């Protein structure tokens, strides 16, 4: 085994005070790790994994506690987004975005441009997000995950947004936690730049916000791998 600390991923708070998850990311592409899953990647600078002495790792997370599974493995199923929910701001038509989501037809985002689109998974989902790009050096991508469109009014001491019709984009707006990624611009059609948050996300809607810099960006892919425990 070899290992390398990735200094280009930082886990960020979901809330300014108590942060219940601490799994959402502020990440950026890096020449050091670009293509690290490829067979020809040069890992000569990576450190070799070393055995650790007893007591260095807490017993609560020690491999010595491993036992045979009593439940099935979580399943994985490749899924695509079913629809475009709302086109907030874009240089492309709704049909262009639908072709990108359903057919994975590449979408060119011009330089110095902002895109805000909201997409629909069809139902509440749990899955691993996968994105793929070429070009776009310095472009900033954010993915906000939401279960519903919520109202401006809130309820209770914690000021929780009120939910009426969860799909009402006209009278509501999306609120949720997000991942942010800044592109290195190293991606090509043969070897795209890929961003996949480490842990799965739960969502019914996703708001995709793109801000390009001086380099145009090509969106190649946005889908997810559904996961969960089998119900039967």
Predicted stretch roles:
Residues 1-232:
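Extracellular/oxidizing-compartment recognition motifs
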């Amino acid at each position: 085994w070899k290992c390398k600390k990735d200094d280009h991923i930082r886990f960020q708070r979901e809330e300014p005070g108590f942060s219940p998850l601490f799994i959402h990311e502020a990440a950026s592409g890096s020449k050091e790790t670009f293509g690290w899953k490829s067979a020809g990647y040069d890992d000569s600078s990576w450190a070799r994994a070393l055995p650790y002495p007893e007591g260095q790792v807490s017993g609560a997370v020690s491999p010595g506690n491993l036992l045979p599974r009593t439940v099935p493995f979580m399943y994985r199923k490749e899924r695509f987004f079913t629809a475009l929910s709302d086109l907030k701001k874009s240089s492309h038509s709704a049909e262009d975005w639908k072709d990108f989501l359903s057919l994975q037809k590449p979408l060119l985002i011009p330089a110095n441009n902002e895109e805000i689109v909201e997409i629909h998974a069809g139902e509440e989902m749990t899955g691993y997000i996968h994105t793929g790009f070429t070009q776009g050096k310095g472009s900033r991508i954010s993915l906000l995950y939401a279960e519903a469109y919520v109202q401006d009014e809130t309820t209770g001491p914690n000021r929780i947004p009120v939910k009426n019709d969860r799909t009402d984009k006209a009278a509501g707006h999306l609120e949720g936690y997000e991942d942010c990624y800044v592109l290195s611009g190293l991606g090509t059609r043969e070897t795209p730049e890929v961003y996949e948050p480490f842990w799965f996300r739960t969502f019914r809607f996703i708001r995709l916000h793109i801000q390009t810099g001086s380099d145009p960006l090509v969106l190649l892919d946005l889908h997810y791998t559904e996961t969960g425990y089998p119900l039967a």
